[in-house]
Curated annotation (Swiss-Prot):
The entry's keywords: ATP-binding, Cytoplasm, DNA synthesis, Kinase, Nucleotide-binding, Transferase
SUPFAM superfamilies associated with the record: Glucocorticoid receptor-like (DNA-binding domain), P-loop containing nucleoside triphosphate hydrolases
UniProt-listed InterPro entries: P-loop_NTPase (IPR027417), Thymidine_kinase (IPR001267)
Catalytic activity of the protein: thymidine + ATP = dTMP + ADP + H(+)
Principal EC category: transferase
Subcellular location, record wording: Cytoplasm
Keyword Transferase found: yes
Pfam families: TK (PF00265)
EC number: 2.7.1.21
Originating gene: tdk
MF terms in GO: ATP binding; thymidine kinase activity
Name of the protein described by the UniProt record: Thymidine kinase
Organism: Xanthomonas campestris pv. campestris (strain ATCC 33913 / DSM 3586 / NCPPB 528 / LMG 568 / P 25)
Quaternary organization: Homotetramer.
Length: 209
């Protein structure tokens, strides 16, 4: 039975790596997948989904006006049966788009796997995450670690000096240089202005090609 899944975490927990591995698992078994990625996230190039450890795949882009059920129906009409839809950066979905993805599951009987942040740099839910938490059939946390050694559940936006940024737009695309995953206790401390956090994380070594 097809389901709507939401895999959520703080920054740098390996969400995109997990998405790409899931897509690979389907394709390895001869099943066709569609990866959806927001237009506003073009760090790796438009329509390219890339993880921090070097995995990459092409995806279809969407913005807040894209009707996702129609997008998937057109994909099937053009390319044949589809076995799974995977959504990167799902926090950027609108509530209407989350509902459309639930229709992909319920009407087309295609599983939809969404990967995204739960909360923004203020500790507040993104719209997409809010409605995925409400409507998804299955919820799973992808865990990562705070510099304190505790589980990281929050994401803080920092400036060049490592101090918390408390104002600004909710959506600001950036990677390790802008955001740090922390525990709730550390989030409270840095938001109070107690200390700083080095925004740069050690690059992961890649195996030789």
């Amino acid at each position: 039975m097809a389901k709507l899944y939401f895999y959520y975490s703080a920054m740098n927990a390996g969400k995109t790596t997990t998405l790409l591995q899931s897509a690979h698992n389907y394709r390895e078994r001869g099943m066709r997948t569609s990866i959806l990625t927001p237009k506003l996230d073009h760090r790796a190039g438009s329509g390219v989904v890339a993880s921090r450890i070097g995995l990459r795949a092409d995806g279809q882009t969407f913005d807040r006006q894209t009707e996702l059920l129609q997008l998937i129906e057109r994909d099937i009409a053009a390319h044949g049966p589809l076995h799974c839809v995977l959504v990167d950066e799902a926090q950027f979905l609108s509530s209407a788009q989350v509902w459309q993805l639930s229709e992909v599951v319920d009407r087309l009987r295609i599983p939809v796997l969404c990967y995204g942040l739960r909360t923004d740099f203020r500790g507040e839910l993104f719209e997409g995450s809010q409605f995925l938490l409400a409507w998804a059939d299955e919820l799973e946390e992808i865990k990562t670690i705070c510099h304190s050694g505790s589980k990281a559940t929050m994401t803080v936006r920092v400036d060049a000096q490592g101090h918390a940024v408390q104002d600004g737009p909710q959506v600001e695309i950036g990677g390790n240089e802008r955001y740090v995953s922390v525990s709730r206790a550390e989030f409270k401390k840095i938001m109070r202005g107690e200390g700083r956090i080095d925004p740069l994380q050690i690059a992961l070594p890649l195996p030789p090609a």
